[in-house]
Amino acid sequence: MSRPEHIAPPEIFYNDVEAGKYSTNTRIQSIQTEMSERALELLDAEGPSFILDIGCGSGISTQIGESQGHVVVGMDISPSMLSVALESQEIEGDLLLCDMGTGVPFRPGTFDGVISISAIQWLLNADKTCNVPQRRLNRFFQTLYISMKRGGRAVMQYYPETEKSQQMIMDTARKAGFAGGIVVDHPESKRQKKYYLVLQAGGTRTLDISSMTLDQEGTNAKQRKLKKKQDMSTREYIIHKKELNRKRGRLHVPKDSKYSGRRRKAAF
């Protein structure tokens, strides 16, 4: 099967039809959710943080970051994907239409951390004569380093096409000032194998990635998600949703009462 970046540029490939799959296809949602939770786990943020989500797409990773107490800003090159994200009732943070290959357009030291799911492999896509992969990589990592606080961590899941492209990405990140390496989850499995570029922007703390890899017996992201849902009661979830809708200015949001979240008796 052809890789998406071989078919068309991202702003064209992720059109209304393709973007719609991210809100209707449960398999895509499940995979994206699992990778997003793993990226946030590797980010290892100390308390609520200000996070940039690069290539946020339909907002799945943005939403998961917010559900863990973080403030998340999303950026993506596809208008269709951002439209899907805007239609979501879950996302509170801002969304930005931007090509990461032209640089990360934020002030120095803005973000505590950065996540990215299935995005940075597009930087190697030379779909236009002006898009030189090495130049785009340089611009991306240099501006990303500047936009992060010192000691901040970036975790980017991606699909490397070749060992050469994988090394090219790692070398460019190091030249920009980052420390770190690549974490490979489930390295023995062809279907479950996932690559995460884990980077640290300076700071005094040493980044050790040797113990970060998951094998087949490792922690299951679905189990973590289930436990998290169990920790929030039905009443708490309903009140949380109501509060979100009020902040967005939605009309006719029911008032909270002692009956909120209670199961109704069967009708006669």
Swiss-Prot record:
Give the UniProt entry's GO cellular component terms: cytosol; nucleolus; nucleus
Which biological process, per GO, is one annotated for this protein? rRNA (guanine-N7)-methylation
Q: Where in the cell is it found?
A: Cytoplasm; Nucleus
What span is annotated as the signal peptide, if there is one?
A: none
InterPro entries named among the record's database cross-references? Bud23-like, Bud23_C, Methyltransf_11, SAM-dependent_MTases_sf
E.C. number, please? Answer: 2.1.1.-
Q: Name one GO molecular function term.
A: rRNA (guanine-N7-)-methyltransferase activity
- Which keywords label this protein? Cytoplasm, Methyltransferase, Nucleus, S-adenosyl-L-methionine, Transferase
Instruction: List the residue ranges of the region (Disordered).
Output: 246-268
UniProt enzyme class = transferase
Catalyses: a guanosine in 18S rRNA + S-adenosyl-L-methionine = an N(7)-methylguanosine in 18S rRNA + S-adenosyl-L-homocysteine
**Similarity comment:** Belongs to the class I-like SAM-binding methyltransferase superfamily. BUD23/WBSCR22 family.
What is the recorded function of this protein according to its Swiss-Prot or TrEMBL entry? S-adenosyl-L-methionine-dependent methyltransferase that specifically methylates the N(7) position of a guanine in 18S rRNA. Important for biogenesis end export of the 40S ribosomal subunit independent on its methyltransferase activity.
- Per its record, how is this protein called by name? 18S rRNA (guanine-N(7))-methyltransferase bud23
Q: Organism classification, top ranks?
A: Eukaryota, Fungi, Dikarya, Ascomycota, Taphrinomycotina
